Amino acid sequence: MSEREQRIRIAVVDDHEMFRAGVIATLQPYFDVVGQAADVEGSVAMIAQTKPDVVLLDVHVPGGENGGGAEILTKSRAYSPNTVFLALSVSDSPQDVGSVIRAGAQGYVCLLY
């Protein structure tokens, strides 16, 4: 496969297993899903190991120092500096949006039901 034909490598971070499974099932035909995690520590380790092109990142993730997605982003940068982070959340709180954008997320998608 040529470099131009290489599929984008994606990781999914969310503490809800069913949501992760749905996102992964939807993306797998089009992207290489290289990892998934449910908490801060597991996410940082997975990102350091897999170095994905893109991380789809929940804002509210347990563990760590209670920093959630912003903490994952900050801690992962040293291990995977070229990874693009896109936050996904049901929260439209300005504090939540601001925390991950300030930490370096490239975008924020609000999942309203």
Regions found by a protein language model. Give the residues of each.
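Acidic, metal-coordinating helix/loop segments flanking the phosphotransfer/catalytic sites
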Residues: 38-54
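Two-component/phosphorelay signaling modules centered on CheY-like receiver
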Residues: 17-35
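Active-site residues of response regulator receiver
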Residues: 58-60, 89
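Conserved small/polar residues in nucleotide/adenosyl-binding loops
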Residues: 113
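A short, hydrophobic beta-strand element within the central beta-sheet of small alpha/beta folds
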Residues: 82-92
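Short amphipathic alpha-helix used as the core "switch/output" element in two-component signaling
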Residues: 45, 66-82
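Non-catalytic signal-transmission and effector/linker regions of two-component phosphorelay proteins
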Residues: 1-9
